[in-house]
Amino acid sequence: MLISGSSAALCALALPFAAAKSLWSDSPGNYSSFITTAFPLGNGRLGAMPIGSYDKEIVNLNVDSLWRGGPFESPTYSGGNPNVSKAGALPGIREWIFQNGTGNVSALLGEYPYYGSYQVLANLTIDMGELSDIDGYRRNLDLDSAVYSDHFSTGETYIEREAFCSYPDNVCVYRLSSNSSLPEITFGLENQLTSPAPNVSCHGNSISLYGQTYPVIGMIYNARVTVVVPGSSNTTDLCSSSTVKVPEGEKEVFLVFAADTNYEASNGNSKASFSFKGENPYMKVLQTATNAAKKSYSALKSSHVKDYQGVFNKFTLTLPDPNGSADRPTTELLSSYSQPGDPYVENLLFDYGRYLFISSSRPGSLPPNLQGLWTESYSPAWSGDYHANINLQMNHWAVDQTGLGELTEPLWTYMAETWMPRGAETAELLYGTSEGWVTHDEMNTFGHTAMKDVAQWADYPATNAWMSHHVWDHFDYSQDSAWYRETGYPILKGAAQFWLSQLVKDEYFKDGTLVVNPCNSPEHGPTLTPQTFGCTHYQQLIWELFDHVLQGWTASGDDDTSFKNAITSKFSTLDPGIHIGSWGQIQEWKLDIDVKNDTHRHLSNLYGWYPGYIISSVHGSNKTITDAVETTLYSRGTGVEDSNTGWAKVWRSACWALLNVTDEAYSELSLAIQDNFAENGFDMYSGSPPFQIDANFGLVGAMVQMLIRDSDRSSADASAGKTQDVLLGPAIPAAWGGGSVGGLRLRGGGVVSFSWNDSGVVDSCKADLSARGSDVSQVKFYVAGGRAIDCSS
């Protein structure tokens, strides 16, 4: 990174900089407040949360595929799809809505038996008896290495513990060591379920927990803990009932934890009878644990750290520490955080968001759910499922831009294997089309693609269009044409095919445009009914979906010219979903019926501003439209008024950032941290449990928008070779003065790094554009105020 010498020197003298790379506390977490006090570990598939208790440690354990319900509870499970088609009701629904402006879709609603839920796997217990005279305690989660540690003294004995979850070895590892000798240690696996109760057994130096979520047909799950005592001659018979007991006197003990289920997403199709069932996991888990236990602790840790840092270190953000916060426990910093803010904490949570994504999304895992990977509950809020009218999307907002694009494979596989097969049936049974696929707002891991029973939140077939935005983003940043042809484009094309079949001429305004009918804004009106036509959110999404089909046509390798012609034809008359209403707002519906100061948590009518681009890029220079965006944001409130969610605030922060309104962007960001982030850094839905991870990831996205404006461009601009204008530092607050960023990915390929002065104005930059293809447009960089800046040297 190029930083001008005088600027860097002045910043170093003016403000201290501290690497905000660890969460720490001088006291253990609280078992009764596990989800707000424990520090999380993960390798994509496996999750662990050590509480850090002195002598009776509890580590909460998760495996990402452990769900009850679906075909593991009933052979009649259908993904919510009806037995017979309901599509015959659509013409009448549409006619009524065009005649009256609003209507309902009650004929399309359905029940969702056997939907199921994500659930906790077990607790690992580590009992060292009664310890006294505890002194010098500290626990720490190092974000640089993804290693948890704690240490303390008990009398003359110093005890240190470390834990991590390794992607290369597919296990979590926990180690205890001492300067003299460890007390007797009893290791156990516990699960409180009684119906059906799992079987816990011990053999040699291993504990196995084996269970099923439902009698006979339930999902099989297996967890194994293998204990290793380096240098000891007795490691073959450590069992005591169903626990492993290591005698007093050892200096080092470590264990490996492996787990799996018989869930198999690739069997979620008609060929496999939508069984989602794979092989019994017992032998695989046994082999994984056995292989890992043969390695030394140092070898396991070394491969884990090398793998993790190979991803995490692709991006850096450095903000100042004006308050000397690095010297205070982060649990205190987060508990006492208040506006106007603390750059050290904001930097910490940015790094933490990237850490959490690496820990919950790895090739071969499921994508992060509403709680990422971590739950201590048998029945987490909203089933710990996948909500896709903002939450799943927000989880992936900043992934590609911050160097984590290679970790998105779980999302594409999940969509292709659990949404598309069942979603093709849903398209036919609810919407009368054999073209493409559709799903709705709430999904499990068993292909639940049908509409649930409350229209206000269940009627959301636009999930396929919004998730196609993420398909395009991944291609745009990576420029991986092979991935786009083989994986991304089939998802996007199927969504576009569905919407080609559903667009109808506007018979209310009779303006010749194509609109969606029926629709409603996510979890919002316009009425209690609550369907209407031409919803802004839908129209913007479909406009961008069709635009991406055309923009990526060459890269797709598709020779289906009839499909392309259909897209081109309907794109030309599609209502783009940008209407300015009677009080200067971006209308939420084509009908101008928005209520001023409606502080609903969603910003659905501003999708095209952020994270979309039809407003921000295509019409971003139109002051009438940008004024309407501002009016809408002020009217919508701060996100406190409706449910006080963290995700609503960081969405607002990102929108303000793209308007270059720094004070509002920073205010919303700091408000989210103040109101919603617990002492362990997890985002709490309304400021208290339940935990919902979207704002952890969304905060990263919002901060990226404060750092850079690199909006997507329309297919027309791209084909015309229009220069890609990138604004560095659209909304950097003065509190972050003298900071820097390294490794920001650019659309079309390339990386930019830059630093800024004490006022938040970028004064030095360096770009590496070698990854850009010859057919990608040129990039020009600007700073606040519209001044061009040379990033070439």
Swiss-Prot record:
Annotated GO CC locations: extracellular region
A GO biological-process term: polysaccharide catabolic process
Coiled coil ranges: none
UniProt-listed Enzyme Commission number(s): 3.2.1.51
Signal peptide range in chain numbering: 1-20
Protein name: Probable alpha-fucosidase A
Entry's family note: Belongs to the glycosyl hydrolase 95 family.
Any GO molecular function: alpha-L-fucosidase activity
Alphabetical keyword list: Carbohydrate metabolism, Glycoprotein, Glycosidase, Hydrolase, Polysaccharide degradation, Secreted, Signal
Reaction equations catalysed: an alpha-L-fucoside + H2O = L-fucose + an alcohol
General function of this protein: Alpha-fucosidase involved in degradation of fucosylated xyloglucans. Hydrolyzes alpha-1,2-linked fucose.
Domain of life of the source: Eukaryota
InterPro entries documented for this protein: 6-hairpin_glycosidase_sf, 6hp_glycosidase-like_sf, Alpha-L-fucosidase, GH95_cat, GH95_N_dom
Entry's localization field: Secreted
Glycosylation positions in this chain: N30, N83, N100, N104, N123, N179, N199, N234, N323, N597, N622, N660, N757
